[in-house]
Amino acid sequence: MLRIAATALLSLLLLARHSLRAAEPAAVMNFSCSGSAEANDTRRPVKKIGLTINILERTVTVSGLSVFAHVDSADDVNILFGGESTIPGDLGVTGSIDRVSGEAWYLTFTRGKDKKVNRREMFDLVCKRVQ
């Protein structure tokens, strides 16, 4: 009887440990996003924009952009990110993704030689996790 109880307890402990591992957030999260982009008061649909978030390296990449963003803050729900090139006139990005609902946005901008920020495009997206 003691052997059966010990086996059952060991099984429960192993299951609990496996469940805890499954609940841990993935270090790298890939999203496929669709929605709209707005520039100069003109809105257009966008599809299959890839977002890759690496929590350990604290980086975010957006498909089609030449700049890498850094994770400014992250919690169980929201990830805020931003980054820009050090070369005047090059692209910058700032944004956020709700990893529970999949709602995301990001804004691209350039900064002129005068350090003035010029808005390029605003993206409103709904994202789904992909492998």
Range-by-range predicted roles:
Residues 7-15:
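Bacterial N-terminal signal peptides
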